[in-house]
Amino acid sequence: MTGNDPLANALSGVDNAESVGHLSHEIQPASNVIGSVLEVFYDRGYINGFEFVDDGKAGRFEVELSGGINECGAVKPRYSAGADEFERWEKRYLPARDYGALIVTTSHGVMSHYEARETGIGGQVIAYVY
C-alpha cells in the first residue's frame, strides 16, 4: 500500500481483510500510533491479538482478526474534541449510540472515547471502529 497516511492504510487493510474473511493481516510499516490503536481494538474485543515483528526495517504488525469488525477507518482531518463533545462525533462516525468506538489521541495516550469521557479529558479523534 502506498500513501501519505500510514494509519489510514493500516485500518483500510484491516477493514478489507475482515470483509473477505481472512483470519490474519500484516500491517507494514509499523508505528507507535498504529500499535496503540491496535491495543484499543484488542481491549474492546475487535481483534484477537497482534504482535510486533522486527524485520530490521520499520517493522510490522501481525494482527489476528476475530471477524468482529464491521467497519473501521481513519478520521480525516483529525478533529479536536473536548470531553463533553464526543457525542457529536459519535453521531457522525458510529451507526448507533453505544455501538462501536472512536479512537482518540490525548495527552494521556491513545484510548477509546469511552475512556476519555470517563477520565474527563479531550483530544483528537483519529479513527473509528464498529
From Swiss-Prot:
Coiled coil: none
Pfam families cross-referenced by the UniProt entry: Ribosomal_S8
Keyword vocabulary terms for this entry: Ribonucleoprotein, Ribosomal protein, RNA-binding, rRNA-binding
InterPro entries: Ribosomal_uS8, Ribosomal_uS8_CS, Ribosomal_uS8_sf
Description of how the protein assembles with itself and partners: Part of the 30S ribosomal subunit.
UniProt family annotation: Belongs to the universal ribosomal protein uS8 family.
Function per UniProt: One of the primary rRNA binding proteins, it binds directly to 16S rRNA central domain where it helps coordinate assembly of the platform of the 30S subunit.
Protein known as: Small ribosomal subunit protein uS8
Gene expressing this chain: rps8
